[in-house]
Amino acid sequence: MPEARSSGPDLTRWRKQQQPVRRTVSQVCPPPRRPLTVADIRSGMENERLGVVRDSMFQNPLIVKAAGPASVGTSYSVYDSSAVQKVIPSLAGHHIKGGPQAELGKPRERSYSLPGINFNYGLYIRGLDGGVPEAIGRWNVFKQQPTCPHELTRNYIAMNRGAVKAGLVTARENLLYRQLNDIRISDQDDRRMKKEPPPLPPNMTFGIRARPSTPFFDLLQHRYLQLWVQEQKATQKAIKLEKKQKVVLGKLYETRSSQLRKYKPPVKLDTLWHMPHFQKVGRHLDTFPTEADRQRALKAHREECAVRQGTLRMGNYTHP
């Protein structure tokens, strides 16, 4: 019997927990959100853009950025990450699609894990020689090959100088003088005439100079993107200051002569003839009691124009 008494309150508590949660009409069918405009964007928001900005840019789902990845059972609005508005968890996924969305024209970020410490980059070439032991144990000295004897070149400068001193002028006399006094240039003289190469510093490294290292940390941190954004903001700020500092000229007062100079006498135009059949006829049916009611209805129609646009006449919003 005591067990039957204790089971009564538990059954009542279980029935209370199983009762459905009642929701209001605004929770079940939330009103449509007003599209984003340029006036809603503040500095530091995720949807802040540089350059020429129009209201139509914030109504395009391909350009507008989402607030961020939505957690399980929670949905967020797409206005800005700094002012996230939470929606009822039971309605998650019915009003706004959460999740990251790639910006138009910008590739998705990808990353790969690097290999371990023992990994060697590049190709491994097996040496064909003895390697380090052979290099330490012996030293290959380049043996100079014997030079083959070659004919020495004539020293025409010295032969011409001697012919002039001897008083020989004609070509025949010069030819005979060269046959008798054949002066040749020795290898020692040729080596002395050549300019010796400049002395090299002892710590000089031979080979191709390596290019500067790639700034990987700046690339990974998007440093160049941040510098570009800062330059664009500084340029726009300077343009705004220049517009504010422009001198506004005073009001120009017109005189009687300037008004007479601009005055154009009106030309009376004859009205065109219209057929009686095409003359404007007043409306036969008036569904509005007064003109104020008509203007009020037209104003309401203009306000609902943004909601009735789109493919399905359900409005263009910032969320798909």
UniProtKB/Swiss-Prot annotation:
GO terms for cellular component: axonemal B tubule inner sheath; axonemal microtubule; sperm flagellum. GO terms for biological process: flagellated sperm motility. Expressed in airway epithelial cells. It is found in: Cytoplasm, Cytoskeleton, Cilium axoneme; Cytoplasm, Cytoskeleton, Flagellum axoneme. Changing residue 172 to W: In a colorectal cancer sample; somatic mutation. Keywords: Cell projection, Cilium, Cytoplasm, Cytoskeleton, Flagellum. Microtubule inner protein (MIP) part of the dynein-decorated doublet microtubules (DMTs) in cilia axoneme, which is required for motile cilia beating. Belongs to the CFAP77 family. This is Cilia- and flagella-associated protein 77.
